[in-house]
Amino acid sequence: MTLVFGSSCRLAVTLIFAFVSVFVFCEYVIYYLVILRCSWPLLEIEDSHSPLRALFLSDTHLLGAIRGHWLDKLRREWQMERAFQTSMWLLNPEVVFILGDVFDEGKWSTSQDWEDDVRRFKRIFRHPVDTKLVVLVGNHDIGFHHEMTKQKLERFEQVFNVTSARILTIKGVNFLLVNSVALHGDHCPICQHVEEELQKLSHALNCSIQGAQHNGQCKNAARFAPAAPVLLQHYPLYRVSDAMCTGVDTAPLDEQYLLFQERYDVISKNASKKLLWWFKPRLILSGHTHNGCEVLHEKLYPEISVPSFSWRNRNNPSFVLGTFSQSEFQLSKCFLPEERTVLVVYCSSCLIIALITLIHLKMFRNSLQFTNNLIGKHKTL
């Protein structure tokens, strides 16, 4: 009898250890195993200056108080926190850009809900002091154009220390940060202000590139590194659909030929032409669609749409790694663990543990019955 109960105790300890091991693997270890496969792309031309290493992600969609079920919040936010913290530890980027739709309900959240969302964001995306975090605005952060207000925009800009149009220069690399929600072209006050700022930035950047700061028209212009910028915004530039996209994580086939709506799925054709004409960017990075896309505008300007970072929007989220110099850049994509894989590991492990338990219980009953029979025979004797 003692041997039987001793065996049961050993099984219980083994099962607890198995459950803990599976949990640790699925919630911690798997992120290291997957992200370890990622590496920074190398530039083809060596530069005397060390290149800039930048990480780009998009559409985190932190759930709010209205639509966010607690279990959905817990699962998705934990996934993003582990993915981001593991990436920071393994890859150590110098700058991280989040390309909008940080929150899911910023467009209608109250001041109290907004503060709670911001607190959770800062916990999930905490980063080393030597890593710069730059956040762009998306339609879910301040609302679509007809929902956008000065109050919503200002509270976003105050929290993340951004403006709707500016050039950020790091290691001689110019990043043009644009509030694409305000590129509606209807001359609303916010839209008009953003367009005026973009024109000023275009003028100043062209003066810097041409080295004409002492020219009369450029005398009072701001100075930037003499290099074409990397354009960053939430909405993609105008394209008819995702049918022209290439890449391994494009939209599903049944969605690729759905026509995009200007100012809703992509910025307008006119706004796209203005940005390309004013800045002639060497690269465009955007989000919004939740799918990957690589497309070439006017056979000259490459655009990469960065997929969503959250399991809530896709099974295989990812982010983009970029290595930049003033004259060159290289990109690579880093995929995160797939939600389907984690669920399969959990289900398979639970099934195996259940089978082992059932087999042991059957053996336990047989042993108990055998012991009882022996005791009965002993009493008879």
UniProtKB/Swiss-Prot annotation:
Membrane topology: Multi-pass membrane protein
Cofactor: how bound: Binds 2 manganese ions per subunit.
This protein's record includes keyword Transport: yes
Enzyme Commission (EC) number: 3.1.-.-
Transmembrane segments: 15-35, 341-361
Keyword terms of this UniProt record: ER-Golgi transport, GPI-anchor biosynthesis, Hydrolase, Manganese, Membrane, Metal-binding, Transmembrane, Transmembrane helix, Transport
GO biological process: endoplasmic reticulum to Golgi vesicle-mediated transport; GPI anchor biosynthetic process
Chief site of localization: endoplasmic reticulum
Keyword DNA-binding appears in the UniProt entry: no
Entry domain remark: The di-lysine motif (KxKxx) acts as an endoplasmic reticulum retrieval signal.
Name of this chain's protein: Metallophosphoesterase 1
Organism, as annotated: Danio rerio
Classification lineage: Eukaryota, Metazoa, Chordata, Craniata, Vertebrata
